[in-house]
Amino acid sequence: MTDATDPGALSAALAAALYRLMTWLSPSFPVGAFAYSSGLEWAVEAGDIKDAATLTDWLSAMLSDGAGFCDGVVLAQAYRAASAGDDARLRAVADLACAMVPSRERHLETTTQGRAFVEIASHAWSSARLPPAIAACGGAMAYPVAVGIVSAAHEVPLAAVLHAFLHALVSNWISAAARLVPLGQTDSQRVLAALEPVVAPTAARALAASLDDLGSATFRADLASLRHESQYTRLFRS
């Protein structure tokens, strides 16, 4: 996938895919991710997260054994169903993605971002393959499903999408925690660096997994998202 005249150059197709992927999963892409903490706000108030070390432990678990892995599996399955034009399979994945969200606020978080992502991406990067995939999903669309079908429509390599998606996910979690703990910029980047060895294998597991492999072992994080709904003072919507 490189230019034959320069072994270090990107092919035109790969350069376009990389450009789109970096744009879609950039913090500046307007899906409203900054407004959500995925329950971290309650975890900070409860004392579960109080510094960079405890944040790293919490996010490592969320990535490998919780929302990160599950979202990765859903993204991959939606991507494959959309690529194959399997509308029934895509609808089943989309329905499951919304049904398995553990709390009302997390459901709002993923469906609001999913709707924003697919609307903006489809207007800025139109594709004849997108409208049928959107229609197949039915009503509400979870964020990883939206990323999966848009990436499939533009033939962005799935492995790269998964890695970039999980990096964006954990980056947003860290951004929220930095405002809540609070953490300085250097500590925030140390946490991101510490999670690098977690992102890659989680993406690889999600790539190889089926829907039967979905499951979470982060009950405390799920409980945090539930308890956030009645938290008295809040900065975030989840």
UniProtKB/Swiss-Prot annotation:
Keywords: Chaperone, Cytoplasm, Nickel insertion
Taxonomic source organism: Rhodopseudomonas palustris (strain BisA53)
The protein's role, per its UniProt record: Required for maturation of urease via the functional incorporation of the urease nickel metallocenter.
Quaternary structure (record): UreD, UreF and UreG form a complex that acts as a GTP-hydrolysis-dependent molecular chaperone, activating the urease apoprotein by helping to assemble the nickel containing metallocenter of UreC. The UreE protein probably delivers the nickel.
Main location: cytoplasm
Protein name per the record: Urease accessory protein UreF
Gene3D superfamilies the record matches: Urease accessory protein UreF
Subcellular location: Cytoplasm
Top-level division of the source organism's lineage: Bacteria
Similarity comment: Belongs to the UreF family.
Gene Ontology cellular component annotations, sorted alphabetically: cytoplasm
UniProt GO MF annotations: nickel cation binding
InterPro entries: UreF, UreF_sf
